[in-house]
Amino acid sequence: YIIGAELEGIIGSLINPAHRTQGWHSTGTVGVIGAAAAIGALRGLHGESLAQLLSLAATQSAGMFFQSGTDGKPLHAGLAARNGVWAYELLQHTSLQTSTKPFDPERGWFKTIGNITVTSNDIASRWLAPGQLIDPGLWMKVHPYCSAAICGAEAAETVAHRIYTSSSYVSKHYNVSPDAEEQDQCRLCATPDFSFWEDIDRVTVHFPPGADAALRYTTPSTGREGQFSIEYIVYQVLAYGAVQDELFKIDIIDQEVRDCMSRIERVYDLPKVSQSERITK
């Protein structure tokens, strides 16, 4: 596992963000190579045997970001794992021979996929120094939506908390004096508050230039598309008090919800983020 994650992480750091910008989904394109590396380490492969395994995996490298908002995107992970295993089985049980130079600087995987030159030293110098599982480390999603929406969702949660624990809101809807923690929890369990939206003219979500590229749906029609829509995510937070994971599974988003989302706009007035950074909070 460590070996597979290490190679996958290093490759990802060398080709992204350009790889993503070109429309590739690295879970599929890089994941298959990581899977093969993990299998090779598990089976004790070295030299030519390992090179052929990585070669056969690399030639199956695929996964395109136009699948975002569909079941095709998470399927990339399964296909990458399957193809890594299949590459190993083919080489073990057939007489198949493959190139032993999948990462040749002049015409190998990096040159073909990313049009960049990467040498063996570029990988070796990064190998376990200190290790991809240590730096940058593993990061797990709490909710099933695109990570590009995390900051916007957290900002919306702050706004929602202030609104739903305010004296005016609590008095109007609960006819009791406000207790911030208690009333906030009450909102988390409540049905969506569309009356709240009657008082909203516009919700503005601020981004650095290009930081919302993965959030491709401004008016999603399904829950799956909503995973890649800051509008749908912010709507959930403001209507319920928190993101509702079940809403990403619905087949059709109601018109009333779409009307609320139409009041959410994006502006690009925040400082540009370094291409090597990934904002997670």
Predicted regions and their residues:
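Glycine-rich, mobile lid/loop segments that gate access to catalytic sites or pores
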Residues: 1-86, 98-106
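Terminal-appendage/accessory-domain detector
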Residues: 72-82, 89-281
